[in-house]
Amino acid sequence: MLDRSEVYSGNRVLIGDSISYDQNAGFGEAFGNMCLQDTAQKVMLEGQYGFYNERTEYAFATDSARFLEYSQGDTLYLHADTLEMMSIDSTAREIKAFYGVRFYRTDMQGVCDSMQFNTRDSILYMYRDPILWNEQYQISGDTIVIYMN
């Protein structure tokens, strides 16, 4: 499919300048300005290339990859070279970010090489030279673990 195509799957829509989609296998690839939106969980995954498997609910984005989560009256912006998003069950998901990770929302910002976040336990792991800023504080170390209630 060409010319800014869209593929709908339940609460999710895969958008791209061109899309290769196999309905029988339940997966698609998007090339150029890829966006995977999940309206139920209020998240968006973007990049210049992306892959989505609707059966396993696994998504991958690379080349200017960005993840946005609209929750708690604020938006979390996450940027990295490569992002993976996978559903653990109907309410929990895991996000992994690799290479040149940067994230921010109004109450905190951070940078690191790689990061992992699981919505089930709300623990954020920052790896390899992480730095976290919160108001006037700066935290750094070789690994940072954040418990986010």
Protein language model regions, located:
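Structural signature for solvent-exposed beta-strand/loop edge elements and short helix-capping sites
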Residues: 1-149
